[in-house]
Amino acid sequence: MTLQSLPAPRALTAVSADGTPVHVEVYGPEGAPAVVLSHGWTCSIAFWAEQIRALAADHRVIAYDQRGHGRSPAPAATGGAGYSTTALADDLEAVLAATLGPGERAVLAGHSMGGMTIMAAAGRPALRQHAAAVLLCSTGASRLTAEATVVPLRPGGLRSRLTAAVLGAKAPLGPVNAVSKKVLKYATMGPASAPGRVEACARIVHACPRGARYGWSQVLAGLDLEAGLRELRLPVAVLVGTADRLTPPVHARVMVEALPHCTGLVELAGMGHMTPVEAPEAVTAQIRELTLTYLGVTSGEQEKEKQA
């Protein structure tokens, strides 16, 4: 799962409110309907490779590296000040301003922390101006350590504390090998995940710098974006894997109830947390459905079927 088979992207840098540069890549034809992809914790643009490959033929696909991930450097602020939900929203606003024209609308898709980014930005003028619809994919608004089932204990304070300790560990992840892939698969993917997809996810996650991994883990441990969730007053689809240990389906169901305009909930049987990699066709289909409905886009494949 790489971006090497795609045409070279148009790369640019968006500058966030605190001066942090954000690496952005744009795929697909200029002037095509826009999709903005926001990845999750410890991932990068490469996490969306299958969606970019499928959508870039008839969409302008905008993907960016969250600060501290991929080619976006860590914030200059020390002591964790550069890691916050405000920073997530600032970075997304900067990306929208750098890539979309005045009044231009896009479908936004966020996976895990990328979905939290969209919730954090819900009240921002840029989101209201540019977002036509949203896909919240394998994410949650609050109570992340309380609801996660990575630690195989009954719900309660001990499980929550152990989960926070595991996810917030400062130790390096080490090399990608059979043991590390087994651990990553258990924590983040469904039991039937193909070895190649486990390998791809492991390489992406292990490439995340330790400082960014730890800095963002502290934000996620205390996350509360329930107000932002309720402020997403636009069409929002929700997707989750039934075997997700990091953001179990309880989060998706809470979001469905809280969202002012939820278009539906998709639960993918047997899939874990890494749904864009584990079930790329299903995630891409949800994005296409949103672009068709809210941007009036008909895919090239649908056009061929009509002409046949």
Each model region followed by its residue ranges:
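Conserved HGGG/HGGXW glycine-rich cap/lid loop of the alpha/beta-hydrolase fold
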Residues: 20-81, 95
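Conserved alpha/beta-hydrolase "acid-adjacent" motif
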Residues: 245-251
